């Protein structure tokens, strides 16, 4: 399967696997920011992705993010 990724900003970091055998890739924001308690924010990643027809990309919390910092993503589905 081929997934096309296009940088929308020069400082964007293309998703990558942190460790061999990881089930998912790490995503990185292109901006630094602070979150206030209970604040919600859309996080800019700086790239676009083309998911093949019949598939979806899933966005999940990084291991320990919620437990250590109380930060929870609302998950995401990137349709083809």
Where are the regions a protein language model picked out?
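DUTPase catalytic domain/fold
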Residues: 1-80
